[in-house]
A protein has these predicted regions:
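Glycine-rich, aromatic-bearing surface loops/beta-hairpins
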Residues: 130-174
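Helix-adjacent hinge/juxtasegments
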Residues: 76-100
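Basic amphipathic alpha-helical segments that dock to polyanions
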Residues: 102-116
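Long, compositionally biased intrinsically disordered regions
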Residues: 1-5
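Minor-groove-contacting beta-hairpin "wing" of winged helix-turn-helix DNA-binding domains
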Residues: 122-127
Length: 174
């Protein structure tokens, strides 16, 4: 029989690695918000960019090498390394594998009201909301590294016109 503390630590570990779409919804909110803030035209990202970001974030070998100061070109050079190419070769599979998770996270974000769909542009937009005092800190403290990574990806992706350019920069076939 599993003790209570073992169950609690297992649950905390599962949440820490953002294995639930609820945390994914918050990460998508942060990605969409940061992406739009970085764009001169304030345009939100398309679904393909969200799928790429979640796929990169879900693979710890890739996400652990993302740093804002280095930029997307440095990340691409990292991927081109002999050992790292194997990690990135499967990104198409990772995108396909994480698609149900990404869609579930978007669905939860829509249900909670932190993101909305713009039917005219077919994009997902962040909704400004005021969390109760202290709530945001509790959420972000638990997943600080993931928030930094997802915001870095948003800043990188926002520099390019569309998802095809981002995919080309990362040498991903869409």
């Amino acid at each position: 029989m599993i003790g209570r503390s073992e169950m609690t630590s297992a649950l905390v570990e599962e949440l820490r690695i953002w294995n639930t779409p609820v945390i994914g919804a918050y990460l998508i909110y942060r990605f969409v918000k940061t992406f739009a803030q970085e764009r001169p035209d304030k345009r939100p990202p398309d679904l393909i960019m969200l799928c790429l970001a979640i796929a990169v974030l879900s693979d710890r070998r890739l996400s652990n090498n993302i740093r804002l100061r280095r930029g997307i070109s440095s990340f691409r050079r990292y991927l081109e390394g002999e050992k790292n190419a194997v990690a990135f070769d499967g990104i198409h599979d990772v995108v396909a594998k994480t698609l149900p998770y990404t869609l579930a996270a978007i669905d939860i974000g829509l249900a909670c009201g932190i993101v909305r769909v713009n039917a005219e542009s077919a994009t997902i937009e962040a909704v400004d909301f005021r969390a109760r005092k202290g709530t945001n800190e509790i959420i972000t403290d638990a997943i600080t590294d993931d928030v930094k990574i997802i915001e870095t990806l948003a800043k990188w992706f926002a520099k390019y016109e569309n998802s095809s350019v981002v995919a080309d920069k990362l040498e991903v076939l869409l």
